[in-house]
């Protein structure tokens, strides 16, 4: 939500629209001016709380988003934190830890949790970061396609590793980049069921880890709204049929 819309009046109006549509708000995602997903290199430089030059301002903005989520009655905020530095002894990593702890303490004061979206780190590095932060309101929004799109690991194996921290999920699909280009070039997002995630296996694994929360469909083609709506509709049908099959 943009700054000008983060008001009590806007929250009241939005809640009314959601109520009329039968929609329950399960998470409020934060995003920032200046972020770009044009390619992986640009994503590293611009996304989330990792870029040092924008970190302080973005932490403050996430605090305001947390306050707005509270007005909406939502106990979960989420974001792409960015590419967490690999060197856990570096000053950049330690400063990111401190900023994340500061943000989480504010979020906790609103009786909320923060879910980090997967994809930009391997499962092991994400677990290291969560454990280093040492806050009990830091969890994961698991997006299986992002593991493929970023080339950071098999999504099912990653889900098994991080399962105890998963509090929300995306249902999104994608195909791997060519061998030798994974992690350097994007994979390709595709309609649910057409990619390399393996949706039935994904849902079965969610059951195995005890996940019983919402299955949030994400289809990131805002430039083609009609196709986006059609793909989301097909995704609903696929998930319903798979859930019936799995039981």
Spans of features found by a protein language model:
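Conserved beta-strand edge residues that scaffold enzyme active sites
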Residues: 1, 32, 83-84, 121-122, ...
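Glycine-rich, proline-tolerant flexible connector loops at the mouths of alpha/beta enzymes
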Residues: 1-18, 81-88
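Short, solvent-exposed loop/turn segments at secondary-structure boundaries
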Residues: 2-7, 53, 88-93, 151-154, ...
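Vicinal oxygen chelate
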Residues: 3-5, 44, 180-186
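Soluble or luminal CAZymes and related metallo-dependent hydrolases
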Residues: 6, 10, 54-61, 95-99, ...
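Histidine-acidic metal/acid-base catalytic patches
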Residues: 12, 19-22, 36, 101, ...
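Active-site acidic/histidine proton-transfer and metal-coordination neighborhood
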Residues: 19-20, 36-139
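Conserved alpha-helical segments that form or flank metal/cofactor-binding pockets of metalloenzymes
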Residues: 25-28
């Amino acid at each position: 939500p943009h700054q000008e819309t983060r008001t009590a009046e806007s929250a009241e109006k939005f809640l009314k629209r959601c109520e009329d549509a039968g929609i329950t708000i399960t998470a409020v995602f934060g995003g920032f001016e200046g972020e770009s997903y044009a390619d992986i290199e640009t994503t590293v430089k611009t996304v989330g709380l990792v870029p040092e030059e924008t970190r302080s301002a973005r932490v403050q903005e996430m605090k305001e988003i947390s306050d707005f989520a509270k007005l909406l009655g939502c106990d979960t905020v989420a974001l792409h934190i960015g590419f967490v530095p690999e060197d856990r002894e570096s000053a950049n990593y330690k400063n990111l830890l401190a900023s994340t702890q500061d943000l989480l303490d504010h979020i906790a004061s609103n009786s909320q949790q923060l879910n980090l979206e997967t994809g930009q780190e391997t499962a092991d590095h994400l677990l290291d970061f969560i454990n280093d932060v040492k806050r009990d309101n830091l969890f994961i929004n698991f997006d299986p396609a992002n593991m493929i799109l970023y080339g950071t690991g098999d999504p099912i194996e990653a889900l098994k590793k991080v399962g105890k921290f998963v509090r929300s999920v995306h249902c999104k699909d994608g195909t791997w980049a060519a061998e030798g280009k994974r992690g350097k070039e994007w994979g390709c997002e595709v309609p649910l069921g057409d990619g390399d995630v393996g949706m039935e296996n994904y849902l079965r694994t969610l059951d195995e880890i005890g996940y019983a929360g919402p299955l949030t469909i994400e289809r990131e083609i805002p430039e083609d709204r009609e196709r986006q709506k059609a793909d989301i509709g097909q995704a609903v049908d696929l998930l319903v049929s798979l859930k019936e099959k799995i039981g």
